[in-house]
Structures are given as structure tokens and as C-alpha cells.
């Protein structure tokens, strides 16, 4: 594919298309800020003494912090990717420590037109930590915009359920 995957139209995507993001180093301030925003002050993330005696020997990043940062690392084109539709099979595979750099590797696993204006794209989503080892893995579904010419022609099957952001042929904000 010549167009970067996260800037492509739905029709330009194929199963197996993949991407990898730049890195981001996790700092102590990230753990403190995330704890303050979410109220998750578990000592594994917030108490160095407690965490030092625990199974990881030191504080580690919140799993949800890693998942949240992974979405921010992905260079998403808002004119193409309309909405996050879902996350399934989320697994926190290994800890990420303060000072460790994460990146994301994603690959298209399925494509389904859901409306003349959009399609549903499933991605194998991996947050990578030290040495490229998988720290978090999930199945991510995103609502992807179809090319305007395709939408105008009305191609695609209406496969919409009650949770879909598409109703009456329109993508809802």
C-alpha cells in the first residue's frame, strides 16, 4: 500500500496491511498524571516502597495508561477514521516500567462495509515495550470513512446493529 494505513480510505485497505508508530518513553509523571485523572492510585503504580516488595520489584505503568497512550501514538487521520467502535480481547501481557519506551504495531485483520459512507475495520493492536515485546494486545475495531465516490454510488451492505454509530444511512457524531 502506498498510502499510510491510518490515512487510507476504507477501499484502499487490505487484510494484512500494517503499521508501526514512533516510540514514547513512559515517565514517572505519566503514572502520577494518569492516577490523578482516573483515581487509580493502586500502590503498584503510586507507591515505590510497596511496589518494590511486589512481584515486579518496582512501580509499573497502568495497563489502561498504555492502551490510552497507544491510541495517541497512532497517526490517525480524522478525515478517514471516524470513531473507535470497540476493543475486544484486551490482554496485559507484561509490565512496562518507568523509563521504558513503548510503540504500537497494528495490522488489519478484517474489513466489512457497513454503510455507503463507512466500513468497519478490525485491527490486531499491539503495544510493544522493551525489545519489541508485546505488553498489551487487543482487537480494535474502528469506523473508517469510504471514498466519496463509493459513498455516492451507494455501494456496501447495510450491516448495522443497535450499537452502530450509523443510522438511516448517516454516520452519527
Language-model segments: residues:
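Hot-dog-fold acyl-thioester-processing enzymes
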Residues: 2-85, 147-173
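Mid-chain, well-packed structural core segment of small domains
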Residues: 79-98, 104
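HotDog/MaoC-like acyl-thioester-processing domains
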Residues: 1-14, 96-101, 105-173
Amino acid at each position: 500500500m502506498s498510502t499510510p494505513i491510518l490515512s487510507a480510505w476504507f477501499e484502499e485497505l487490505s487484510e494484512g496491511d500494517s503499521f508501526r508508530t514512533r516510540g514514547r518513553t513512559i515517565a514517572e509523571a505519566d503514572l502520577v498524571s494518569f492516577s490523578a485523572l482516573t483515581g487509580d492510585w493502586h500502590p503498584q503504580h503510586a507507591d515505590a516502597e510497596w511496589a518494590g516488595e511486589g512481584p515486579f520489584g518496582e512501580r509499573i505503568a497502568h495497563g489502561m495508561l498504555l492502551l490510552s497512550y497507544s491510541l495517541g501514538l497512532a497517526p490517525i487521520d480524522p478525515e478517514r477514521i471516524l470513531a473507535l467502535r470497540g476493543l475486544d480481547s484486551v490482554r496485559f501481557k507484561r509490565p512496562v516500567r518507568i523509563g521504558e519506551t513503548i510503540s504500537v504495531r497494528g495490522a488489519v485483520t478484517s474489513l466489512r462495509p457497513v454503510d455507503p459512507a463507512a466500513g468497519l475495520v478490525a485491527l490486531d493492536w499491539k503495544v510493544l515495550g522493551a525489545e519489541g515485546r508485546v505488553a498489551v494486545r487487543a482487537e480494535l475495531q474502528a469506523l473508517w470513512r469510504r471514498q466519496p465516490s463509493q459513498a455516492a454510488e451507494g455501494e456496501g451492505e447495510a450491516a448495522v446493529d443497535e450499537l452502530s454509530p450509523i443510522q438511516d444511512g448517516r454516520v452519527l457524531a
